[in-house]
């Protein structure tokens, strides 16, 4: 009798979490209720990147709003309002947003592509609408940028660096920004189609994340659950040539063998045939290039790549037992990273 009672108690304890999980899943609205669509307007008139969105051209674009809180109160209205608009022309896509905040967090300035504590807005473009890959762009209230590539729906790398522009402006109501994303950075098929799109806002002091196209935390998928951006069609290939030269140098000094007397001049003197045997210098020059053949096809090449060097200009104090890892930043080796 006691054994049967104990078995029933254990079974009830095991079934309770699954029942609660099932109740939470059933409590979520159907997926169709989260779908969002926005229409991007073709730019008519100039847009100056000053962060204020005060040009008449912005008024022609549909106003996006109605964010939903993802954290900490999942599904609740946001604490403050966020409004955004999207423009485009033959060369770029423009994203502008106004972020209300009566008590903005202290801006933390940092290097590009560094996650820091602070307020920011990020947005994703799935330009091929394959629901697996997307370009990620992020603008902090302090003005710094971060970008990367989403792949396999839920994975992301920030190793990819795109050349795009943004500007931030602060007002008594909060802050706003304008961003210009050149089309030459994006793979866009020639055929007319919609983009996958979503925009997010982080409020650091409240530990809050607001989403335009709300993604419930209990359901898997990131890029497959983006909203839809319509109106960008008739784009012609931007045949831009991008060149990234680099120069590297290395100096090696070898100390003379013990007991060997070497004139001081020999350690640093140059001769007609080069440096002295105790000083050896090496120099290398290379080039990465990219040429857009079509809106979704690019020729990427490299000349004399330096396989032994990575970007290492950031000082890193490593007190752990693990080696310091520096991410790959050379564009040639990052092209197609979402495919391999």
Residue ranges and their predicted role:
Residues 7-16:
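Bacterial N-terminal signal peptides
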């Amino acid at each position: 009798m006691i054994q049967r009672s104990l078995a029933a108690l254990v079974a009830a304890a095991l079934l309770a979490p699954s029942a609660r999980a099932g109740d939470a899943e059933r409590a979520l609205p159907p997926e169709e209720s989260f779908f969002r669509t926005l229409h991007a307007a073709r730019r008519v008139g100039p847009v100056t990147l000053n962060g204020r969105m005060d040009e008449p051209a912005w008024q022609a674009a549909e106003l996006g709003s109605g964010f939903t809180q993802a954290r900490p109160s999942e599904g609740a209205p946001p604490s403050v309002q966020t409004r955004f608009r999207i423009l485009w022309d033959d060369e770029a896509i423009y994203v502008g947003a106004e972020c209300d905040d009566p008590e903005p967090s202290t801006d933390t300035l940092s290097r590009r592509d560094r996650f820091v504590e602070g307020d920011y807005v990020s947005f994703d473009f799935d330009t091929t609408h394959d629901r697996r890959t997307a370009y990620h762009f992020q603008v902090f209230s302090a003005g710094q940028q971060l970008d990367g590539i989403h792949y396999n729906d839920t994975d992301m790398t920030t190793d990819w660096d795109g050349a795009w522009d943004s500007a931030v402006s602060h007002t008594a109501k909060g802050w706003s920004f304008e961003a210009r994303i050149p089309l030459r950075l994006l793979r866009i098929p020639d055929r007319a189609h919609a983009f996958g799109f979503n925009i997010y806002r982080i409020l650091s002091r409240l530990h809050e994340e607001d989403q335009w196209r709300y993604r419930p935390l209990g359901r898997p998928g990131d890029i497959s659950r983006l909203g839809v951006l319509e109106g960008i069609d008739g784009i012609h290939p931007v045949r831009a040539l991008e060149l990234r030269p680099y120069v590297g140098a290395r100096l090696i000094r070898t100390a003379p063998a013990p007991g060997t007397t070497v004139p001081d001049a020999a350690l640093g003197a140059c001769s007609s045939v080069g440096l002295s045997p105790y000083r050896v210098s090496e120099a290398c020059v290379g080039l990465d290039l990219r040429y857009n053949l079509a809106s979704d096809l690019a020729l990427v090449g490299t000349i004399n790549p330096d396989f032994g060097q990575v970007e290492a200009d950031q000082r890193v104090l490593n007190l752990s037992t693990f080696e310091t890892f520096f991410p790959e930043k050379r564009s040639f080796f990052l092209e197609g990273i979402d495919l391999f």
